[in-house]
């Protein structure tokens, strides 16, 4: 999965600058906050040359399992339906008239499984990124400035005052600092993430708490992390 810097949009023109100690600590905690919450409701906006996709659903950061409903934007409905994914697999349930939100209990049949693609698919890259936004422990705050983490501005997301910061996409991807933007609240809560993937020109946007979190139930063919 290739990850590159997404620039512009919503940041204060005075940025970038080095992070303060408080900002470093909040950025180090932000993925752990998702794990602490067990799961978060998400809306994943995936751009594409032939029209985009929007995934509305939930991610369980303890079990590394996501579940949602997919709708196409600016394209036909051939990709619409339910979706559930892990770090290595994807299961889809096509629906001609997909609901606005996924049902709390997934259908027992009608699912088709496949491996999650590590490259070449903007959707699969977006799903993998969303799963990677949780960690069972805080990131190393001392290493973040060394890896190029920076502050880019202030913004508001659904009434929450946030700082926009760049940093690594996950604990084991320190080289991606300055390539992923996080909208982080005063307590370290993550409200938005924006990142570009190599297969499309516009960034993927992941918004949190866009609807009520619904606990994720595994479907046949998708094995969550224990």
Task: List where the protein language model places each region.
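Short, exposed beta-strand/loop patches in secreted or surface proteins that constitute
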Residues: 56-62, 81-84, 148-155, 182
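Gly/Pro-enriched, hydrophobic low-complexity segments
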Residues: 158-225
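Beta-turn initiation residues at beta-strand->coil junctions
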Residues: 44-47, 69-74, 92-96, 169, ...
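Short, hydrophobic/aromatic-rich segments at coil-to-beta transitions
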Residues: 36-43, 62-69, 158-166, 188-193
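An acidic-aromatic
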Residues: 63-132
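Solvent-exposed helix/loop surface patches that form functional interfaces
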Residues: 104-157, 221-225
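Solvent-exposed loop/turn segments connecting transmembrane beta-strands
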Residues: 47-53, 73-80, 173-174, 199-201
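N-terminal leader/targeting segments and the immediate start of mature chains
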Residues: 1-62, 215, 220-226
């Amino acid at each position: 999965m290739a990850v590159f810097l997404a620039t512009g949009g919503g940041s204060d023109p005075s940025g970038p600058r080095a992070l303060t100690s408080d900002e470093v600590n909040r950025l180090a905690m932000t993925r752990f906050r998702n794990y602490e919450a067990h799961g978060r409701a998400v809306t994943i906006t995936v751009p594409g040359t032939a029209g985009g996709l929007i995934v509305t659903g939930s991610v369980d950061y303890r079990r590394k399992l996501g579940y949602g409903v997919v709708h196409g934007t600016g394209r036909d409905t051939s990709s619409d339906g339910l979706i559930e994914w892990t770090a290595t697999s994807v299961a889809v349930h096509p629906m001609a008239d997909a609901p606005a939100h996924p049902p709390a209990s997934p259908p027992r049949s009608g699912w088709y499984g496949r491996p999650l693609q590590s490259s070449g698919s903007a959707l699969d890259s977006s799903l993998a990124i969303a799963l990677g936004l949780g960690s069972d422990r805080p990131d190393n705050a001392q290493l973040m400035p060394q890896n190029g983490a920076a502050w880019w501005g202030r913004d508001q997301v659904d009434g929450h005052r946030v700082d926009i910061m760049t940093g690594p996409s996950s604990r084991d991807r320190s080289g991606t600092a300055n390539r992923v933007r996080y909208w982080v609240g005063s307590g370290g809560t993550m409200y938005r993430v924006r990142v570009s993937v190599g297969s499309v020109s516009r960034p993927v946007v992941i918004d949190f708490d866009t609807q009520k979190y619904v606990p994720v139930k595994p479907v046949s063919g998708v094995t969550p992390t224990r």
